[in-house]
Amino acid sequence: MIILGIDPGSRKTGYGIISKQGNRLIHVDNGAIFTQSAKDFPERLEKIFTGLSEIIAQYRPEVVAVEDVFLAKNAQSALKLGQARGAAIVAAVNVGLPVHEYTAMQVKQAVVGTGRAEKAQVQQMIKALLNLPEVAQEDASDALAVAICHAHSAGMSALLKGVR
């Protein structure tokens, strides 16, 4: 199963693609879509949508996992983040892909084993789990973490369905 993880942001949207083969997780690609803050916000949303649509067309994931919105101190920032998430989700559902959402705490729990892990701990675990030569860029690392979270969650769901 190929999983696309997305860490949405209005300035940088991270993506991480992994392949789950049995119990193995294999790194496929990761990176970020950068938008220019000088551009009008709708143009930035279009760049997120188009960039993710191209990534979906290239790698053909079977499922998309997106990090859920955190509570921001600034209401305007929270609204922009929500709109960036919307652009990312629409890129997936536009081609019929299922979308699963995970909180930051769920992602940290799945990757490190504790929902209160520090960002550096998560990055080091991703490097180890995916056998990366170096720690991925922050937004890409977060997206890989979301993909890993889904891989673990999907595996658990499949096990539970088999028990019933």
From Swiss-Prot:
Binding positions (Mg(2+) 2): E67
The keyword Metal-binding is assigned to this record: yes
Cofactor: binding details: Binds 2 Mg(2+) ion per subunit.
CDD domains, per database record: RuvC (cd16962)
A GO-annotated cellular component: cytoplasm
Transmembrane spans: none
Binding, Mg(2+) 1: D7, D139
Keywords, alphabetical: Cytoplasm, DNA damage, DNA recombination, DNA repair, DNA-binding, Endonuclease, Hydrolase, Magnesium, Metal-binding, Nuclease
UniProt-recorded Gene Ontology molecular function terms: crossover junction DNA endonuclease activity; DNA binding; magnesium ion binding
Compartments, as annotated in UniProt: Cytoplasm
EC identifiers of the protein: 3.1.21.10
Reaction it catalyzes: Endonucleolytic cleavage at a junction such as a reciprocal single-stranded crossover between two homologous DNA duplexes (Holliday junction)
EC primary class: hydrolase
Any GO BP: DNA recombination
Residues at the catalytic site: D7, E67, D139
Function of the protein: The RuvA-RuvB-RuvC complex processes Holliday junction (HJ) DNA during genetic recombination and DNA repair. Endonuclease that resolves HJ intermediates. Cleaves cruciform DNA by making single-stranded nicks across the HJ at symmetrical positions within the homologous arms, yielding a 5'-phosphate and a 3'-hydroxyl group; requires a central core of homology in the junction. The consensus cleavage sequence is 5'-(A/T)TT(C/G)-3'. Cleavage occurs on the 3'-side of the TT dinucleotide at the point of strand exchange.
Subunit and partners: Homodimer which binds Holliday junction (HJ) DNA. The HJ becomes 2-fold symmetrical on binding to RuvC with unstacked arms; it has a different conformation from HJ DNA in complex with RuvA. In the full resolvosome a probable DNA-RuvA(4)-RuvB(12)-RuvC(2) complex forms which resolves the HJ.
PANTHER family referenced in this protein's UniProt entry, alphabetically: CROSSOVER JUNCTION ENDODEOXYRIBONUCLEASE RUVC (PTHR30194:SF3)
HAMAP family, alphabetized: RuvC
Protein family (similarity comment): Belongs to the RuvC family.
Entry protein name: Crossover junction endodeoxyribonuclease RuvC
